[in-house]
Regions:
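A short beta-strand-loop structural module common to alpha/beta enzyme folds
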Residues: 26-40
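Pocket-lining segment of extracytoplasmic ligand-binding domains
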Residues: 128-219
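Beta->alpha turn/N-cap motifs
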Residues: 11-12, 37-39, 48-61, 146-153
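Secondary-structure end/capping motifs
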Residues: 190-260
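Hydrophobic residues within well-ordered alpha-helices
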Residues: 44-46, 137-138, 261
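A structural signal for short loop-to-beta-strand junctions that line the ligand-binding cleft
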Residues: 4, 66-74, 97
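Hydrophobic/proline-rich hinge and linker segments of small-molecule sensing/allosteric domains
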Residues: 69-90, 170-188
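Bilobed "Venus flytrap"/periplasmic-binding protein-like clamshell domains
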Residues: 2-22, 82-143, 150, 252-256
Length: 263
């Protein structure tokens, strides 16, 4: 069976899915792989263009009629949330726009969760692709923005300022891990096929865990940042037991998030 798979180029995704993409032994599937940033993947799934994808957890209520949330292959964890950064200093500026990495991203929802909980005034929001958010902060074109992925590890060396760890704020206020991303599969594939897809993802992850090195040429080639230490830190932070099985705590975090999305 040939299926369309969508994942990002971030090291945690390419680490988990590399063996699957390159072809597992005796696999019933062949994959047409689409690499894109998470907001683009969210939009592709909302248009029904992918059979299987890694998307923002926030987007799921908008696609749940057509897609099943898989029990593995996502990104949930502790101490791994998006960061609200400033290019000019340590104080949040309500009068200045905040640049977010896509309207459907979990990062956008976590910012709004923090903004509402802390009683901030009405805020102007702008959207850009995640790497553009970071570039605009580095160039001081933007005063403040929310960064994700590899840029979580590079802001200090680039002279930016931390205003709020949005993941830590989520953990403190909900008591649950941070539900960043999930894997989804088209419901029309059928339950048995979806179970097979989950098995394939777990096999791929287990193969990755047995490698001597975290960063392979496949991961290095696709990463948006040319620093193997950052790639390794990224994988260690975002790939964990929740990647293999969402479990009760993971489901609790997703349920809390989806309740917020649905209002």
């Amino acid at each position: 069976m040939r299926l369309k798979l969508g994942i990002s180029t971030c090291p945690n995704d390419t680490y988990i899915y590399e063996a699957l993409v390159q072809g597992l032994e005796n696999s019933p599937f062949e994959w047409d792989v689409h690499f894109a940033d998470v907001q683009t993947l969210n939009e592709m799934v909302r248009r029904g263009e992918l059979d299987v994808a890694k998307v923002s957890a926030q987007v799921y209520p908008k696609i749940e009629a057509e897609y099943a949330c898989l029990s593995c292959g996502g990104a949930i964890g502790y101490g791994c949330g998006p960061l609200l950064l400033s290019s000019v200093g340590n104080a949040f500026c309500p009068e200045k726009p905040v640049v977010l990495p896509g309207a459907d991203t979990t990062a956008a929802l976590l910012f709004k969760f923090w903004h509402k909980k802390t009683g901030q005034t009405e805020q102007k929001i702008e959207y850009a692709l995640f790497d553009q958010v970071y570039r605009s902060l580095r160039s001081k074109e933007a005063v403040q923005g929310v960064v994700i992925h590899e840029h979580r590890f590079t802001w200090k060396r680039d002279g930016l300022y931390l205003l709020q760890d949005l993941g830590a704020f989520w953990e403190e206020n909900t008591g649950t891990p941070i539900p960043l991303g999930i894997a989804v599969a088209r419901k029309s594939l059928g339950v048995n096929t979806i179970f097979q897809i989950e098995d394939e993802i777990r096999k791929s992850l287990n193969i990755a865990r047995k490698r001597e090195k975290l960063v392979t040429p496949f991961i290095d080639k696709l990463a948006q940042i040319d620093d193997p230490n950052v790639m390794e830190a990224h994988i260690r932070m975002f790939v964990n037991d929740f990647s293999e099985e969402v479990g009760e705590r993971g489901r609790a975090s997703l349920g809390y998030l989806w309740t917020l999305v649905k209002g």
